[in-house]
């Protein structure tokens, strides 16, 4: 299968030029190893059955032997021998050079008892996610998020994605292997991913045996509460309405933390701007999966189910947009936050860059009525921001699913279909 360009390619190259070792994190099956292979000049596959036992023994006897090879040297599945971490830190210290090692793993963390140093100053971290629509080829990329931060007077782009396309893309997800397949074969990958998480990965995180039925019920409840600031108690209560087996809030919290560690879920933190008047800002995180297909798979939904329930589709579409915005923001040294205050004023995404610039984004599946509502929300929030203490937003955008064009409204709000957006 031909390698597709990843936005992480440029990020990895940048990090290799500034640090001795880079650890690529992210969910399983998101393409970490394949992306690292493109820039590696030598590779050690720790889990190669032909050499696994030898590799593990050598890691115990003299790990430095495993680090020999042209640089950058990729150490894949390094967590199988956690002592490699300290060996790599030592090599980076003594080589006095950048771009020496790239580490990838299967999303299950290493046993830290054999790791005596944090890696601060020697390692850089790179988080990868499933593919954005631009990376998988469904977005034409005619509108750049980076360009929006320059507040252009005019944007023009044509959107080719229709509602049926979006329903399929939500359920397929951004898994690279799925993106190379068609139809039912592509849709099946998310179901396989969820099964692997439930049956194996959630218990491999920290060696704690977790119940598969409880995990599935928890994921279903999480899917029903995505895009909200639901507390763990709310998620548990939702589980109990559909199952007689009780689970405590503490236990549910430990399950969610395990899912967070293996990048199944990735909540959005609250944005706390300077406002003109005192307004209580809700600080609870907003619940999201790292890819919308996880939620549709765990609920047993397909594209036709979403088309028949556009309210539910809207929730999953929001998760897709947050995924893509995070991929794009990473490339711009940015983060994606969420805003909600006590009066119910909400902003689905705040893209905040390291240099202090930020953009406000509302996600709407489509239709003039919803687009107008989104634009009104953005303008209301922008009017509350104390611009004596912080910058005006660089842009306000309604990110849509349907609609034929990307354009700038008379009030300055951009309307951009997700099928036109890139980093």
What are the residue ranges of the model-derived segments?
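Hydrophobic anchor at the beta1->P-loop junction of P-loop NTPases
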Residues: 24
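Short glycine-rich substrate-engagement loop in P-loop NTPases that contacts/grips substrate
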Residues: 44-72
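N-terminal pre-Walker A segment at the start of P-loop NTPase domains
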Residues: 1-13
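Conserved catalytic/switch belt of AAA+ P-loop NTPases
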Residues: 85-109, 117
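Interdomain motor-coupling "hinge/lid" segment immediately C-terminal to the ATP-binding subdomain
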Residues: 113-228
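Accessory nucleic acid-recognition modules appended to NTPase machines
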Residues: 183-357
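Conserved lysine of the Walker
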Residues: 32-33
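Domain-level recognition of nuclease-like catalytic cores that cleave nucleotide substrates
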Residues: 401-423
């Amino acid at each position: 299968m031909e390698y597709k360009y990843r936005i992480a390619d440029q990020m990895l190259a940048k990090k290799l030029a500034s640090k001795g070792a880079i650890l690529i994190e992210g969910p399983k099956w998101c393409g970490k190893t394949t992306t690292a292979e493109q820039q590696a000049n030598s590779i050690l596959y720790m889990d190669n059955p032909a050499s696994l036992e030898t590799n593990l023994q050598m890691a115990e006897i003299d790990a430095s032997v495993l680090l020999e090879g042209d640089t950058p040297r990729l150490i894949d599945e390094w967590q199988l021998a956690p002592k490699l971490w300290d060996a790599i830190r030592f090599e980076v210290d003594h080589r006095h050079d950048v771009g020496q090692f790239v580490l990838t793993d299967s999303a299950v963390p290493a046993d830290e008892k054999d790791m005596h140093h944090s890696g601060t100053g020697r390692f850089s971290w790179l988080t990868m996610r499933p593919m954005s629509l631009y990376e998988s080829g469904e977005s034409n990329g005619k509108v750049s998020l980076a360009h929006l931060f320059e507040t252009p007077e005019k944007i023009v782009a044509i959107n080719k994605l229709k509602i049926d396309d979006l329903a399929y893309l939500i359920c397929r997800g951004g898994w690279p292997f799925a993106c190379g397949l068609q139809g039912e074969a592509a849709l099946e990958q998310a179901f396989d991913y969820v099964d692997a998480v439930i049956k194996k990965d959630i218990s491999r995180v920290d060696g704690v045996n977790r119940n598969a039925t409880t995990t599935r019920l928890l994921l279903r409840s999480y899917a029903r509460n995505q895009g909200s600031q639901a507390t763990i108690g709310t998620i548990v209560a939702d589980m109990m309405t559909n199952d007689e087996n009780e689970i405590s809030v503490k236990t549910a919290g430990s399950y969610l933390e395990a899912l967070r560690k293996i990048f199944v879920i990735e909540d959005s933190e609250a944005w706390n701007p300077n406002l003109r008047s005192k307004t209580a800002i809700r600080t609870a995180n907003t619940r999201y999966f790292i890819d919308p297909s996880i939620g549709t798979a765990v609920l047993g939904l397909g594209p036709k189910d979403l088309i028949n329930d556009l309210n539910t589709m809207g929730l999953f579409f929001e998760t897709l947009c947050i995924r893509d915005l995070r991929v794009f923001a990473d490339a711009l040294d940015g983060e994606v936050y969420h805003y909600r205050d006590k009066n119910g004023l909400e902003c689905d995404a705040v893209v905040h860059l390291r240099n202090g610039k930020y953009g406000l984004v509302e996600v709407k599946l489509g239709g003039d009525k919803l687009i107008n509502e989104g634009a009104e929300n953005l303008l209301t929030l922008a009017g509350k921001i104390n611009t004596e203490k912080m910058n005006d937003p660089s842009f306000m955008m309604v990110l849509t699913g349907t609609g034929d064009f990307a354009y700038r409204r008379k009030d300055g709000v951009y309307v951009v279909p997700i099928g036109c957006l890139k980093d």
